[in-house]
Amino acid sequence: MAAYQTYTMAGIKEDFADWVSNISPEYTPLISMIRKFPVHNTMFQWQWDVLKDVDTENQHNEASDAKDVELTPTTVVQNYVQIMRKVVFVSDSANAVSSHGREKELFYQLKKAAKELKRDNEGIFLLKDRAGDAGSATKPRLTASFGSLIDASMKKTADLDEATLFEMTAKLYTEGADPTLIMYHPSNANFFASLQEKSGTRMRIFENDKRFVKQVEYIVDPLGQELKCIPNRWCPEDATYIFNPSDLGMAVLRAPKKVALAKSGSAEKYMIEQEVGFRLNNPKAAALIIGKYKEGGNGGGESVKS
């Protein structure tokens, strides 16, 4: 007589993992590193100024009159806070049943929504050319993005290569900025790795080190400015930002808040909402390269750290 096998059994208890795998990226480098400051209006403003050019003819006769000079006012910049939200709508039945990997479906969905909101925030701030808009009764307010607040003279549309990168870091140095970071889309990582090479030959081989390292963590430009290289998934593929985090800020009119909305039948609806905006203290304190890296392009830098 044949042995009784599982193939003919009834009532076998299913084996279901009590967790949920989700590898969707959550890290938001930009908003994690910049300062948050409160605002009390939907429009917020700030000022910037500049010193006059150096006057190498600043020489005067003894006992001469001090003549009047024309003074220039500060420049006022404005931006707006933008309402961002996520809505979760879960039936009472879905919230009551026992589920693998979470205790209550509502709490699980709210946790996901909070992470998604943070990613939306990062992506909006990093847009290249999204202008601010005061909005109206029928149109939402828009916060101007990082790229749109950078002065036109500090932007360049070109392939991402060594010459362009160092041209922009030199511009920042000349203007008096103090850049410490380069933020780029991961698709351009090979450009930064290429800076370790010269004429197709790898420059650094460490004895007894079995690792093959392509990553470049820091770049020192010809003027001695040391910049940390940070990939950011939420950067546009053709945008590379050069800046100092201390020159950026996130205006907060309303911090993220979970709000229970009116119950609809046998379902619960919650909203997570915030009202925030972006600030760049000075339009010449950051630079933007609009373009992608082309394999085989102009790499070959020497001043790198990994």
Swiss-Prot record:
Transmembrane domains' residue ranges: none
Q: State the signal peptide span.
A: none
* Assigned keywords, A-Z: Capsid protein, T=7 icosahedral capsid protein, Virion
InterPro entries with a match to the protein in the record: SU10_MCP (IPR035198)
Pfam families xrefs: SU10_MCP (PF17236)
Where in or outside the cell it occurs: the entry states: Virion
* GO-annotated cellular components: T=7 icosahedral viral capsid
What is the name of the protein in this document? Answer: Major capsid protein
Q: Which organism is it from?
A: Serratia phage KSP100 (Serratia marcescens bacteriophage KSP100)
